[in-house]
Amino acid sequence: MGSQIIHNSQKPHVVCVPYPAQGHINPMMRVAKLLHARGFYVTFVNTVYNHNRFLRSRGSNALDGLPSFRFESIADGLPETDMDATQDITALCESTMKNCLAPFRELLQRINAGDNVPPVSCIVSDGCMSFTLDVAEELGVPEVLFWTTSGCAFLAYLHFYLFIEKGLCPLKDESYLTKEYLEDTVIDFIPTMKNVKLKDIPSFIRTTNPDDVMISFALRETERAKRASAIILNTFDDLEHDVVHAMQSILPPVYSVGPLHLLANREIEEGSEIGMMSSNLWKEEMECLDWLDTKTQNSVIYINFGSITVLSVKQLVEFAWGLAGSGKEFLWVIRPDLVAGEEAMVPPDFLMETKDRSMLASWCPQEKVLSHPAIGGFLTHCGWNSILESLSCGVPMVCWPFFADQQMNCKFCCDEWDVGIEIGGDVKREEVEAVVRELMDGEKGKKMREKAVEWQRLAEKATEHKLGSSVMNFETVVSKFLLGQKSQD
């Protein structure tokens, strides 16, 4: 009897497993913090590579955690390196798929054998780390999969099998990679999606290799998603209701629980121990906020291509001179590894010409930057976190998608949500200059800003009180799935 009482008094224990890239770790950290605030004991599992990057960027105590929020790590199976760069995504996907199951199983066995922590009662895993499902099933605990892409991109991934059936993938040869073919090929078989072209589909589809790793990975992970207890998406009902509704017939229950940064901000004090826990792999330069404080409202364009995008030297130079030619003030985040294979260096004469109206940083607190009154526009790679943060702050966008879900995100930003203007893939300084001016000063830019402010209102409505759609959905996922009884063998 006594042992039963002790067992019932133990906290539920969630193991959170993000895919090991910055844009996946941040939203998973928010989910983990929200669960911790609801009384869960949290184990947050990074790869050894990223665990070591955290320690280098944030100090040796950065991952000490709290008594009920612990960090663990598992090997990703790739050769060890000390570089502070984003790993090759294809190699990482292949390696996690093949190599992570055994170390993850061993980690959970070790946790469950310990005396000082409650037994693992549920798992929340990135949708791209579905090997975790095998362990959840072995333990008889529920698993919620978190797909960190947009709903529209996830729906496209769910239909990749049809591209193969219809002979659209792989492409027959390199000649099909032309702009004309990608723009002229209409895709009319994804539910709810209209006027979609092959160029808008997540970029992994653009392969001539019948054994392409990323196609195999997408097919495998979307198929395995059907085994989850439930699926959560970092979006909100007003933004992607039709898309999410279309998934419900082919998947376990799907819930919109975003924007997660708004949900977390509403519930977690920034200055609290849990609030101060950071998940950034790069050290943020806070000075950019001081610089923005000296600028007038809506006067600055912010440029950040995220944590994975790489540019050629030529593209970097074209962006630089386009920004210079626009005459606008700008804050530009240039990661050290932004240029493929070498250090990212902008032309010295560009620096001289723009020194009185620009600030360059290697990384910054993006959410704080986008919410700053001085920011009037955002030149973005269309990563989903960036788009959600921009919409949540009412900031319109210039869109330059790089890979993966970003093409689809760009399409919806520009054509469905009316908050974006696209720049062509082969960057030209004249186009950059013209589009930045249109965004900041033009009639189209003004309409986009008004629309962005409307989306801001709807994002806040979904997250700011207990009747918000995302708040209610999050509570449902917690009570119905994560706190549900262990499944019986």
From Swiss-Prot:
List of residues binding UDP-alpha-D-glucose: 307, 364-366, 381-389, 403-406
Source organism, top-level taxon: Eukaryota
An example molecular function term from Gene Ontology annotations: glucuronosyltransferase activity
Pfam families in the record: UDPGT
Protein name as catalogued: UDP-glycosyltransferase 85A1
E.C. code: 2.4.1.-
Tissue-wise expression: Expressed in root tips, lateral root initials, root apex, shoots, leaf periphery, leaf primordia and flowers.
Family: Belongs to the UDP-glycosyltransferase family.
The entry's keywords: Glycosyltransferase, Transferase
Cited PROSITE patterns: UDPGT
InterPro entries: UDP_glucos_trans, UDP_glycos_trans_CS
EC category: transferase
Function of the protein: Involved in the O-glucosylation of trans-zeatin and dihydrozeatin. Also active in vitro on cis-zeatin. Not active on N-glucosylated substrates.
